[in-house]
Amino acid sequence: MRPIFVFSAMASAVILSGCSPVISDTLLSPAERQERSIEHARAAVKAQKSGNLANLRSELDAAVVGRGGDARARADIGQLMLDFGRPDMAIQVIEPAYKLPALKITPALWNVAFSAATKLDDKALAVKAKTNGLASAEAINLALDRPAAGDRDKAVLILNSLDAIDFLQSKAVDRPADAIKLAEKLAGYAKQSPLALSRCALAYAELSGSPKDLDKAITLAEDALLFAREQGSIAAVVVRLKDTLGWVHLLRGKPQDLDAARLFLREVVDENPDSATSRYHLARTWEALGLLDRAITEYQRVLFLRPDDSETKQRLKVLKTLGGESSGPVK
């Protein structure tokens, strides 16, 4: 499972590429903008339930504007609506972006559209989302062959490339070879972008798994963390990169890797205790180390944060049949 962190589009542009700042000092921090957007999204759900259409529209607009007002913002809020169990409202949020040019639409938006269409059994929208997502990913692939017009354009292209890799790897498309190629291309395009290098590391580790590519993945993940610290990246980015490095160590699976994974992932969970993904990675580490009681406790914490996680439920069930028990209360 991949760590999931959401940033405003403009803030991410500075974070990802080491570019000169383009954000006004008067804007909220990325964390504050994220929290404010979540509040508006929750208010929109309440307005929809009560039938207050005026409030529904204003809260959705505020949530989108709070993330930057672009297609990426709509994808972020659409994903929140999916997380809230409202695929119908996810569609409401993302529809206004459908007519934008391919390069202006992050593939994450089409990922949201495909997920919502699947939940709503809308086959036509599912086909449209997959087709348009592939077109967007190809446009991004071609754009990586050209020099960026400026720092902001380069940073946005990096962000969209990350989303394109996720889209190619998703259940909607399932093109692992294409995802690896795009990740390699992005790492070459943005040689000092921590998240670009980290994403390439994930592609090698999750999609290839060959010993040679796993070694490459470790090197890339280590470089990503080093660059982030040198560039003074915000804490949320550093935590994400440590999570990736720990996860990649676990996937390589040598004895020294398991110790490294344990150290990194325990640190990540201490710094970000509400991350279900990081807790899942730590649970997998305890499982690999044979510490089943600890693994069970951590899987239970994952389900507390993410109740519908079917993979975690299955792993927990298997461990309990092996005789493991929870090592403490779930908090």
Language model feature labels by segment:
Residues 68, 102-104, 138, 191, ...:
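Short coil turns that delineate tetratricopeptide repeat
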Residues 49, 83-84, 115, 119, ...:
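Register position in tetratricopeptide repeats
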